[in-house]
Swiss-Prot record:
Ranges for region Actin-binding: 661-683, 763-777
Keywords linked to the UniProt accession: Actin-binding, ATP-binding, Calmodulin-binding, Coiled coil, Cytoplasm, Disease variant, Methylation, Motor protein, Muscle protein, Myosin, Nucleotide-binding, Phosphoprotein, Thick filament
GO biological process: muscle contraction; muscle filament sliding
Full protein name: Myosin-2
Domain notes: The rodlike tail sequence is highly repetitive, showing cycles of a 28-residue repeat pattern composed of 4 heptapeptides, characteristic for alpha-helical coiled coils.
Cell compartments where the protein resides: Cytoplasm, Myofibril
Keyword Nucleotide-binding: yes
Sites of N6,N6,N6-trimethyllysine modification: K130
Chain positions covered by the region annotation Disordered: 1128-1149, 1155-1174
Domain Myosin motor: start-end pairs: 86-784
Coiled coil: 845-1941
Phosphothreonine: residues carrying this PTM: T64, T69, T419, T1243, T1257, T1288, T1469, T1503, T1519, T1732, T1738
């Protein structure tokens, strides 16, 4: 299992391919009881999960997950797998293998959208019925080069394995994609082709276009484009699949020697051509017909002379004409583009379209029977002209060839008459033949285009053939398809189960071979063997008088009761008739044999074929150029030789099918197959749903459960010996001895023998141990128990060890403390002794003597080192000389090795050539054998035909004899008649005498004749009146058809407009969502990229630092000269070895080349020699590495002594290193030629070095990052603390934000309500459209009835004409008899009298006949009158229907208008909401800003209050004697209370004002400007107050001093105070008047600003009570500060406003300075304060007035909004009522439709009864029609009322939509912004995709290198152990050398 990081390469497809690491861990840790968790059989769901409750006497009680309790037998309970097997990727690995385990594993994976699962060697895929992101380019890249076990299950994995097998095994591959119809075979085929087209060109340049200009795309584009073209002409909708392939195809993709695409070809099988002329009710014909009529390319409609309505063409409209999941317009463009890409010429392209159109016109050809003959004649030539024009034929010739074909009889051509039925059958056969031959020609043309003539070596074939089909009506096509699937299933069984059992034999396991593949042999033999179904069918086709009944009887005689697979079908009521049933592997299929003989013979009109051959259209002439041999051609482009081989003019469809099937099976047997089994999860095409019975049936049919069967009999679980030993060694470690080598197989045998398990449940193979199902799970449980015990013991021992260690430390610490205490006590006792003091003085003097001794020894050592240095210098010079010679020898050795490598390459090339010639010879042998088989078949057929011709010749001889006899008889009769003529002439002469007697009789006859002529004239008058009525009816029908056509066009236009609007709306919504998602993703990716860039920059800096370090290391590496000196000696020794080995290798190479030439391609000796050479090279390399390591160890000691003298040899060391690296590289290249792995090892070693460097740099970075991290951590701590403070302060603002969001949610709910109403209106519109369609169908049916009546009338006219002809014939006979009697009267009077009597009788009979005809004409006249009345009634119904349709159209247009207006309103409301939110936020920020400024002013006023309080105290001391002072204080207190009350009211009103602010839209900007002005004014005035307070303080001090010094100043100040008091009282009165006026104006204004006014009044008038208000304001200040922290971002937007405020503040400061000079006395100060107060009050009163206006407007807006909401609610209710009414009307319409259908049936019956004289039924039907007309009129009245109500609603909706105009403008601005963002997002997305692609490729390279690195590390470990041994030896040798010296 891969980790989450490895799954990241799959991108967003990862969760759809494999469980995440967290899910896997959770599954393993989930509680599970293996003894009680089971699957139990259950009748409804087949199997359910449950837990065992009890077991009693073979019965088991189980409680299911649903809570039900079941009691079943033991064999109906199946154990459940442990949780770690949940959603397992390979079901063959499960512990318990049975049906429910497989079913639930597929179900759980399907529920998680993991649709691919392995089951042993093949892959199971379940159709998801939805798009999944598992086929994207990054997924293709992720699967490339991956082994099957390395990646999740996928069709790409199967494809890549086939590709890799082809490259490595040099064998052709095939991928068989099978399953039932609708299981997803075609989609998986397309994915396989997509994968090969992607990976086989990666890294290659696009192929250049051929100079001829035919190819419009690259080869991979053409391979992919072939699929849409084939799907358009070969796929159709069936009952089970909307895009079912109605032909089989085997696509071969050829690859060159390098694995790149070379070419491709396609073989097709069994195109279902009957679908061209016939479809079932729920199906439709091939897609191309509906693509053309989709009107996506109007020029096609004009060119093909067709309409856009498929119902105009019977061949393509017998079933459905549209498919919900297919867009025919888009598919037409894809088909057209594919034709261009595939290189079809423009002429060929036009021919394809024209032939397709001609097939459609063929269905409209009509023929009628000639009068008094069985000969057919054309019924109109318009359609024939169109068809002939499209095929470049003569219309008259075409019709003549169809009605009068020429047939060769003997040596002459005879014109043959055809009946209407025969001509219709011939037209259908021609249409099928043209379509089939065109399809096969297109396939051949595609193969011609895909054949690039490039060298190709192997191919991969992809088989996509129609799945098993069981329909209600199954014909010959279904038998062929099901037989093909039967053969493929047999091939699958043989391949899968034989391989499984061959592996047992290969591993040496005793096994009895079981032939599972023979299970299907009985059914296959029944169909294809001699005297089988196909054989009997072909035999019947040989006999001219054979019929379907004779064929059926032969089948019954031959097989019924004799073959178990052949049965008589059961008769089921309501189901199509069936003649026999076959038991296939997928179920029992009932077949109907009607028309099989004709289908099998497939005859064509040879005269028309001759016209085709002479056609001016080259393509058509080419299709039928080999008409006699065309029937023998193969069904695919690859089977071109089939027709030429057969060469006969008569080959049946079944024989051709069997021939192609045998070729397919031969192809498959010559390849290595890969199987993909597709599963249908449910019949309803519901994503995510799985029907248990259906899936189990398919699993049984597909062989999945058959594979489980062999797994249960065999050994499904298998593990390599080494893996088993490693994993399960813990079960009994003593069984495998430690410290000695033991083979993994023997270790596994010992281990299993020592475990208490059933030893018959496993077998030992050569490389693996095989287990029965379930045993591996038991071993897992035992291992878990053992691990639990071991871990418990380990924990106990660890804890004991730690406790003992801690105890030992405590003991050691205790002893050390005792020791230290003892020594200190002893020292304290002796430190005052005199001797001890002497010792302390002498001790330091002893060190100088020791240092002198050490200096002497160091000098001696220095001398020795100097001598050794001189010796080493001499040695170094010698080694340098040796190194030069060694370098020359190395170069020579290198040249020799290179020569050997060239010889080896030549040998390998010769070997490859021999292998190629062998393959070519084998291919030629296969071709020769195939030709021989074909020739044998041809001979057999020729002999059979010879016998048949001999029989025919004998029959012809008999016919000739009979004709000769009849000729003789005819001659005798001729002579007799001549004699009679002579006698008659003699009698004529005698008859002349009797003329006179007959004159009287002649007159009587003339009178009778005149009477008949009069009667005939009356009949002709009646006929004329009938023809006039007929013409009138035809005109009415034409008018109705024209009106119906207009209605259809209108309806189609409306539907297109509606679909376009809905599509645009959905696209807009989806695009917005996609843009938002992509924006978030891109933001995240940008952050990641920025982080990566910063990391890369830091890495670059580290690399620079590393470069400096490497320069230092270069100097250190110079010390390795001594190592290289030792290596020189080793190189000499290795050179001798290499020389010897080289000679041996060259000799062996010559022997190998001779053997190869003698053996003609035998490569086994070459492989063995390669292995030997590889081993010898490995030995050489190990010897060289050992010598190198040995010398490194020896040089380590010398490096310490000669470190100073090595600097000069640095350059030489570098040269030696380069030489060494070059030699190693050359060795690795030689090894790479022998074995490809050597190059990987070299790259891995380099990567390892780079990684080590990167590791060192990363360590340095890590240390730096740690320091940075600590600093960042400190900053983070500071920031977190600050954030905590900010969060506490932001609580209040978040609460207000929640309130605003609640309001937004309320508005969004309103928006959703509107959208729901819009959806409801859409639904009603769709229902109205459906009703309109139903009425259109009714009109069409009534037209059909009119046609039937017209045909009956024509038949009556024809019968009347026949009677007239009979009458005229009788008159002529009378005249003849009269003349005869006149001539013979004299001689034969008596005979004439008798003739006269006879003539009179005949005349009487004729008259009676005329009377009967007249009666019949009268009855027909009455019938015609009645039918005419009915037609007029129907016309009235049609007119009413048209009126209803017009009303519905009008209603639909009104609904469209309402829909558009509501859309516009919703968009404008949304924009209005966003604007109001934005403006509310800005207003809130401005409000909080003003509050902030105001609270700052309050802080400044605090000092003012304190100073004013002191001043008031002084003034109160001075004014104690004034009686008026108390009165004033009392009044001020009243005012204070009143102001406080107003304050409370203002606070309550503030909340209401904040709520109402949300509804203000247009006035907010003006308020903001005014608020800015107020703020600047307040700031200015606050600054003035600050300065005034300071000045007041100074003035008050001076005044107090002056008042104390002089009484005059006191009196003056007292008078001033009295004057001030009076003035303030007057000012106070004025202020009260202004205040009352302001209160009246601001009654409905913003209470927030009134609160501010109250606070200002309270501060200025009652300074002594300001402390309490100050505390309240402090609380408010705290709240505002918390809000301000949240709104800091918005404050930045208002900086411009703040700058303006700063400028006004500076002006105010200047004014404050001027005022401070004027304010010197208390009187002037108080006066200025009062003036300021007045100004503020006037400003505030103005603001309040304006706010009152704003609030009034807000209330008006609210009332309008409420009124609009109530209106919308009323409209919603009325719309709901209208919807109910529409639903009722819809139901009535459906009833009417059903009634109309019943009436049509009854009308047909009534017409038949009318012809027979059934007048009672006609009267009943007429009464019923009148009742229905009354009901239709009542329904029309209701519809009119509904339309009136809708018009009222439309007016209301228009009134509401006017309010959404501004929102629409905002949405346009937003749309522009979205477009810009979309452009940016696309650019970001493109960059991100490029980056992801690059990262994926790098990641793949990294994984590959990592894998190679692991292998190199293993080899390095082995080499390291050997190096250590050599180092030990080298140290010993070095010590010996030193000791000897």
């Amino acid at each position: 299992m891969s980790s989450d990081s490895e799954l990241a390469v799959f991108g967003e497809a990862a969760p759809f391919l494999r469980k995440s690491e967290r899910e896997r861990i959770e599954a393993q840790n989930r509680p599970f009881d293996a003894k009680t968790s089971v699957f139990v059989a259950e009748p409804k769901e087949s199997f359910v999960k449950g837990t065992i409750q009890s077991r009693e006497g073979g019965k088991v009680t189980v409680k299911t997950e649903g809570g039900a309790t079941l009691t079943v037998k033991d064999d109906q309970v199946f154990p459940m797998n442990p949780p770690k097997y949940d959603k397992i990727e390979d079901m063959a690995m499960m512990t318990h293998l049975h049906e429910p385990a497989v079913l639930y594993n597929l179900k759980e994976r399907y529920a998680a959208w993991m649709i691919y699962t392995y089951s042993g060697l093949f892959c199971v895929t379940v159709n998801p019925y939805k798009w999944l992101p598992v086929y994207k380019p990054e997924v293709v890249t992720a699967y490339r080069g991956k082994k099957r076990q390395e990646a999740p299950p996928h069709i790409f994995s199967i494809s890549d394995n086939a590709y890799q097998f082809m490259l490595t095994d040099r064998e052709n591959q095939s991928i068989l994609i099978t399953g039932e119809s609708g299981a997803g075979k075609t989609v998986n085929t397309k994915r396989v082709i997509q994968y090969f087209a992607t990976i086989a060109v990666t890294g290659e340049k696009k192929k250049e276009e051929i100079t001829s200009g035919k190819i419009q795309g690259t080869l991979e584009d053409q391979i992919i484009s072939a699929n849409p073209l084939l799907e358009a002409f070969g796929n159709a909708k069936t009952v089970r699949n909307d895009n079912s392939s109605r032909f089989g195809k085997f696509i071969r993709i050829h690859f060159g020697t390098t694995g790149k695409l070379a070419s491709a070809d396609i073989e097709t099988y069994l195109l279902e051509k009957s679908r061209v002329v016939f479809q079932l009710k729920a199906e439709r014909s091939y897609h191309i017909f509906y693509q053309i009529t989709s009107n996506k390319k109007p020029e096609l409609i004009e060119m093909l002379l067709i309409t856009t309505n498929p119902y105009d063409y019977p061949f393509v409209s017998q079933g459905e004409i549209s498919v919900a999941s297919i867009d025919d317009q888009e598919e037409l463009m894809a088909t057209d583009s594919a034709i261009d890409i595939l290189g079809f010429t423009n002429e060929e392209k036009v021919s394809i379209y024209k032939l397709t159109g001609a097939v459609m016109h063929y269905g409209n050809l009509k023929f009628k029977q000639k009068q008094r003959e069985e000969q057919a004649e054309p019924d109109g030539t318009e359609v024939a002209d169109k068809a002939a024009y499209l095929q470049s034929l003569n219309s008259a010739d075409l019709l003549k060839a169809l009605c009068y074909p020429r047939v060769k009889v003997g040596n002459e051509y005879v014109t043959k008459g055809q009946t209407v039925e025969q001509v219709s059958n011939a037209v259908g056969a021609l249409a099928k033949a043209v379509y089939e031959k065109m399809f096969l020609w297109m396939v051949a043309r595609i193969n011609q285009q895909l054949d690039t003539k490039q060298p190709r070596q192997y191919f991969i074939g992809v088989l996509d053939i129609a799945g098993f089909e069981i329909f209600d009506f199954n014909s010959l096509e279904q038998l062929c398809i099901n037989f093909t699937n039967e053969k493929l299933q047999q091939f699958f069984n043989h391949h899968m189960f034989v391989l499984e059992q061959e592996e047992y034999k290969k591993e040496g396991i005793e096994w009895t071979f079981i032939d599972f593949g023979m299970d299907l042999a009985a059914c296959i033999e029944l169909i294809e063997k001699p005297m089988g179904i196909f054989s009997i069918l072909e035999e019947e086709c040989m006999f001219p008088k054979a019929t379907d009944t004779s064929f059926k009887n032969k089948l019954y005689d031959q097989h019924l009761g004799k073959s178990a697979n052949f049965q008589k079908p059961k008769v089921v009521k309501g189901k199509a008739e069936a003649h026999f049933a076959l038991i296939h592997y997928a179920g029992v299929v009932d077949y109907n044999i009607t028309g099989w003989l004709e289908k099998n013979k497939d005859p064509l009109n040879e005269t028309v074929v001759g016209l085709y051959q002479k056609s001016a259209m080259k393509t058509l002439a080419q299709l039928f150029s080999g008409a006699q041999t065309a029937e023998g051609e193969g069904a695919g482009g690859g089977a071109k030789k089939g027709g030429k081989k057969k060469g006969s003019s008569f080959q049946t469809v079944s024989a051709l099918f069997r021939e192609n099937l045998n070729k397919l099976m031969t192809n498959l047997r010559s390849t290595h197959p890969h199987f993909v089994r597709c599963i249908i999860p449910n019949e309803t095409k519901t994503p995510g749903a799985m029907e248990h019975e259906l899936v189990l049936h398919q699993l049984r049919c597909n062989g999945v459960l058959e594979g489980i069967r062999i797994c249960r009999k065999g050994f499904p679980s298998r593990i390599l010996y080494a893996d088993f030993k490693q994993r399960y060694k813990v079960l009994n470690a003593s069984a495998i001895p430690e410290g000695q080598f033991i083979d993994s197989k023997k270790a596994s045998e010992k281990l299993l023998a020592s475990i208490d398990i059933d030893h018959t449940q496993y077998k030992f193979g050569h490389t693996k141990v095989f287990f029965k199902a379930g045993l591996l799970g038991l071993l897992e449980e035992m291992r878990d128990d053992k691990l639990a015990q071991l871990i418990t013991r380990t924990q106990a021992r660890c804890r004991g060890f730690l406790a003992r260690v801690e105890y030992q430390r405590m003991v050691e610490r205790r002893e050390a403390i005792f020791c230290i205490q003892y020594n200190i006590r002893s020292f304290m006792n002796v430190k005052h002794w005199p001797w001890m003091k002497l010792f302390f003085k002498i001790k330091p003097l002893l060190k100088s003597a020791e240092t002198e001794k050490e200096m002497a020894t160091m000098k001696e050592e220095f001398q020795k080192i100097k001598d050794e240095l001189a010796k080493s210098e001499a040695k170094r010079k010698e080694l340098e000389e040796k190194m030069v010679t060694l370098l020359k020898e190395k170069n020579d050795l290198q040249l020799q090795v290179q020569a050997e490598a060239e010889g080896l390459a030549d040998a390998e090339e010769r070997c490859d050539q021999l292998i190629k010639t062998k393959i070519q010879l084998e291919a030629k042998i296969k071709e020769v054998t195939e030709r021989a088989e074909d020739e044998e078949e041809i001979n057999a057929e020729l002999t059979a035909k010879k016998r048949k011709l001999e029989d025919e010749c004998s029959e012809l001889k008999k016919d000739i004899d009979d004709l000769e006899l009849t000729l003789a008889k005819v001659e005798k009769e001729k002579h007799a008649t001549e004699n009679k003529v002579k006698n008659l002439t003699e009698e004529m002469a005698g008859l002349d005498e009797t003329i006179a007697k007959l004159t009287k009789e002649k007159k009587a006859l003339q009178e009778a004749h005149q009477q008949t002529l009069d009667d005939l004239q009356a009949e002709e008058d009646k006929v004329n009146t009938l023809t006039k009525a007929k013409i009138k009816l035809e005109q009415q029908v034409d008018d109705l058809e024209g009106s119906l056509e207009q209605e259809k066009k209108l309806r189609m236009d409306l539907e297109r407009a509606k679909r376009k609007l809905e599509g645009d709306l959905k696209l807009a919504q989806e695009s917005i969502m996609d843009i938002e998602n992509e924006k978030q993703q891109l933001d995240e990716k940008l952050k990641k990229k920025e982080f990566e860039i910063s990391n890369l920059q830091s890495k670059i800096e580290d690399e620079q630092a590393l470069g400096i370090q490497l320069q230092k290391k270069i100097k250190e590496l110079q010390a390795r000269i001594e190592e290289l000196e030792e290596e020189i000696e080793a190189e000499r020794a290795s050179r001798a070895k290499a020389e010897k080995q080289r000679s041996d290798l060259s000799r062996e190479l010559e022997e190998i080349s001779e053997r190869l030439e003698e053996a003609g391609g035998a490569t086994s000796a070459q492989i063995e020699m390669n292995k030997k050479r590889e081993a010898e090279f490995q030995k050489m390399r190990r010897d060289l590495e050992e010598a190198t390591l040995q010398h490194e160890a020896t040089a380590a000691t010398l490096r310490k002594k000669h470190a100073d003298s090595v600097a000069e040899l640095g350059e030489q060391i570098d040269n030696l290193q380069r030489v060494k690296q070059k030699l190693e590289k050359e060795k690795s290249e030689m090894k790479m030629e022998i074995d490809d792995l050597a190059s990987n090892v070299e790259t891995v070693s380099k990567a390892k070095g780079n990684l080590e460097k990167m590791c060192r740099t990363l360590e340095d970075q890590l240390s730096e990052l740690k320091s940075k991290e600590e600093e960042q951590q400190r900053l983070i701590n500071d920031l977190t603390a600050q954030r905590g403070r900010l969060q506490t302060e932001s609580g209040e603002f978040s609460r207000q934000l929640d309130e605003k969001e609640a309001l937004v949610s309320q508005l969004s709910r309103g928006k959703q309500a509107f959208t729901q109403q819009i959806e409801e209106l859409k639904r009603q519109l769709e229902e109205e459209i459906k009703a309109k369609n139903a009425l259109a169908h009714a009109l069409q049916s009534s037209r059909h009835d009119c046609d039937l009546l017209r045909e009956q009338y024509e038949e009556e006219q024809e019968s009347k004409a026949e009677l007239q002809r009979a009458l005229s014939k009788a008159n002529t006979e009378v005249a003849q008899w009269r003349t005869k009697y006149e001539t013979d009267a004299i001689q034969r009077t008596e005979e004439l009298e008798e003739a006269k009597k006879k003539l009179a009788q005949r005349l009487q009979a004729a008259e009676e006949h005329v009377e009967a005809v007249n009666a019949k004409c009268a009855s027909l006249e009455k019938t015609k009158q009645r039918l005419q009345n009915e037609v007029e009634d129907l016309m009235l119904d049609v007119e009413r229907t048209n009126a209803a349709c017009a009303a519905l159209d009008k209603k639909q247009r009104n609904f469209d208008k309402i829909l558009a207006e509501w859309k516009q309103k919703c968009e404008e409301t949304h924009a209005e909401l966003e604007a109001s939110q934005k403006e509310a936020r800005s207003l809130g920020t401005e409000l909080f800003k003003i509050k902030n400024a105001y609270e700052e002013s309050l802080d400044q006023l605090e000092t003012l209050k304190r100073e004013n309080k002191n001043l008031q105290q002084e003034i109160s001391d001075l004014t104690e004697q004034i009686a008026e002072g108390g009165k004033r204080i009392h009044e001020l207190e009243k005012i204070k209370k009143q102001v406080e009350q107003e304050k409370c009211e203002l606070q309550a009103a503030l909340e209401e004002a904040e709520a109402s602010l949300e509804h203000e839209e247009g006035k907010i900007l003006r308020i903001q400007l005014e608020l800015n002005q107020v703020k600047s004014e307040v700031d200015r005035k606050i600054a003035e107050k600050d300065e005034e307070i300071d000045q007041l303080k100074r003035n008050h001090i001076r005044i107090v001093e002056s008042m104390q010094s002089t009484l005059d100043a006191e009196i003056r100040s007292r008078n001033d105070a009295i004057r001030l008091k009076k003035k303030m009282e007057g000012d106070l009165n004025e202020m009260e008047i202004q205040l009352n006026h302001a209160n009246r104006m601001a009654a409905e204004a913003l209470r927030n600003y009134r609160n501010t006014q109250g606070i200002l009044k309270d501060t200025q008038i009652h300074l002594d009570d300001a402390l309490r208000s100050q505390e309240d304001l402090k609380e408010q200040l705290a709240m505002v500060e918390r809000r301000a922290n949240l709104l800091q971002a918005e404050i930045e937007e208002l900086r411009a406003t703040l700058e303006q405020t700063e400028r006004s503040r500076k002006i105010a400061e200047q004014e404050l300075l001027d005022a401070s000079e004027r304010v010197q006395l208390l009187h002037t100060q108080n006066t200025s304060l009062i003036n300021t107060k007045k100004k503020l009050e006037t400003d505030i009163s103005q603001m309040q007035g304006e706010m009152e206006d704003i609030l009034q407007e807000a209330r008006n807006a609210e009332e309008k909004a409420k009124k609009a909401i109530t209106d919308a609610a009323m409209m919603a209710e009325e719309l709901k009522k209208e919807q109910d009414t529409s639903a009722h009307l819809e139901r009535m319409k459906k009833n009417m439709e059903q009634t109309v259908k019943d009436l049509q049936l009854r009308l047909d019956e009534a017409e038949q009864l009318a012809l027979k004289g059934g007048k009672k039924q006609i009267q009943k039907l007429e009464a019923r029609v009148r009742e229905l007309e009354g009901e239709v009129e009542s329904e029309q009245k209701r519809n009119a009322e509904a339309v009136k109500g809708l018009r009222k609603h439309e007016r209301r909706v228009k009134e509401l939509t006017y309010q959404t105009e501004e929102d629409r403008k905002n949405i346009l601005r937003l749309q522009d912004l979205v477009d810009k963002l979309q452009a940016k997002v696309k650019s970001y997305k493109r960059q991100a995709e490029e980056a992801e692609e690059q990262s994926n490729t790098n990641l793949a390279k990294f994984r590959k290198l990592q894998h190679e690195l692991e292998e190199a590390e293993e080899r390095a470990d082995i080499a390291e152990s050997q190096v250590n041994k050599l180092r030990v030896k080298s140290r010993e040798v070095h010590t010996k050398v030193i000791s000897e010296e």
